[in-house]
A protein has these predicted regions:
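Short acidic/polar mixed-charge low-complexity motifs
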Residues: 18-20, 74, 122-123
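Solvent-exposed alpha-helices and their adjacent loops that cap or buttress functional pockets
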Residues: 5, 14, 43-44, 90-93, ...
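Extreme N-terminal, non-catalytic leader segments
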Residues: 1-23, 172-174
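Conserved NTP phosphate-binding and transfer environment spanning the P-loop NTPase/kinase superfamily
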Residues: 92-174
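Glycine-rich phosphate-binding P-loop
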Residues: 18-43
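Conserved nucleotide-sensing/catalytic segment adjacent to the nucleotide-binding pocket
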Residues: 44-101
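A short, compositionally biased
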Residues: 7-9, 53-54, 112
Length: 174
């Protein structure tokens, strides 16, 4: 790993082969979204979902990827508002495939393409900016289970059968 690893105030959940990195100010719902995604994985709404870390994670560059790890002191712990700190299954690392920015000041109804990409240590990663007061869960599930619209329309109407991209690195650009 590179020397430029950093500790950041964020949560992360591995879904399938990639992690969703959830950033935002204190109280913006990072832990709640992480827990909701884990439960969505258990319910089969998204691929299997496992906590990487909650509240504080470490990011490091590995080639052209960003790897996220839990802070050692917080590994396997998640805050559930109203219940406190709880133990949770976790993985020791995952490659970041999607970034969700909560309370993002640049969130728009139809964001321009450049708003749907972020750059961490020189690595471009698909991004979902979520405005303050908006529910991030449906946006993240949609990003994980649907593909970007194009001139050809799939009339089957079934977003979950075989055509979802499940955190494809081209999620925001494809």
């Amino acid at each position: 790993m590179s020397e430029d690893s950093a500790s950041v105030h964020a949560s992360a959940v591995k879904i399938g082969n990639f992690a969703v990195l959830i950033r935002g100010p204190s109280g913006s719902g990072k832990s709640r979204l992480a827990y909701d995604l884990i439960m969505a994985g258990r319910a089969g709404v998204v691929e299997r979902a496992v906590l990487v870390g909650d509240d504080r994670v470490h990011l490091a560059t590995l080639g052209n990827e960003i790897v996220v790890r839990p802070a050692l002191i917080l590994a396997g712990l998640i805050e559930i508002r109203g219940l406190g700190i709880r133990r949770c299954d976790f993985v020791e690392h995952a490659t970041v495939g999607l970034v969700v920015d909560l309370a993002a000041p640049d969130a728009e109804r139809l964001p321009p393409p450049d708003a749907l990409i972020t750059c961490i240590s020189g690595v471009k990663i698909p991004r979902i900016p979520v405005g303050a007061g908006y529910q991030p869960f449906p946006l993240v599930v949609a990003a994980l289970t649907t593909t970007k619209s194009s001139s050809s329309v799939n009339s089957s109407g079934d977003c979950l059968k075989g055509n979802g991209n499940h955190i494809s690195p081209t999620i925001a650009t494809g």
